[in-house]
């Protein structure tokens, strides 16, 4: 299923659990983050996340605006 068009109802369970990259996804049960910079275990990252840039493992965690 196309991760950009898969259904991600607000507050609902995510049907694209393994590749949740839906724009504006607000699922509460995404198995992975909706933006590549967020760690999979960050529940907040299933909602509004903005990537700030950076490189490396540590920067990956730091640059995610919703994982603080």
Curated annotation (Swiss-Prot):
A single GO cellular-component term on record: inclusion body
UniProt keywords, alphabetically: Acetylation, Copper, Metal-binding, Metal-thiolate cluster, Phosphoprotein, Zinc
Residues binding a divalent metal cation 5, per UniProt: 35, 37-38, 51
Binding site for a divalent metal cation 3: 16, 20, 25, 30
SUPFAM superfamilies from the UniProt entry: Metallothionein
Gene Ontology biological-process entries: activation of protein kinase B activity; cellular detoxification; cellular response to cadmium ion; cellular response to copper ion; cellular response to reactive oxygen species; cellular response to zinc ion; detoxification of copper ion; energy reserve metabolic process
Any one GO MF annotation of this record: copper ion binding
Region (Alpha): 31-68
Annotated coiled-coil segments of the chain: none
Keyword Transport: no
Binding-site residues, a divalent metal cation 4: 34-35, 45, 49
Superkingdom, taxonomy of origin: Eukaryota
InterPro entries: Metalthion_dom_sf, Metalthion_dom_sf_vert, Metalthion_vert, Metalthion_vert_metal_BS
Residues at which a divalent metal cation 6 binds: 38, 42, 45, 67
Binding site for a divalent metal cation 7: 51, 64, 66-67
UniProt similarity note: Belongs to the metallothionein superfamily. Type 1 family.
Protein task: Binds heavy metals. Contains five zinc and one copper atoms per polypeptide chain and only a negligible amount of cadmium.
Protein name as annotated: Metallothionein-3
Natural source organism: Macaca fascicularis
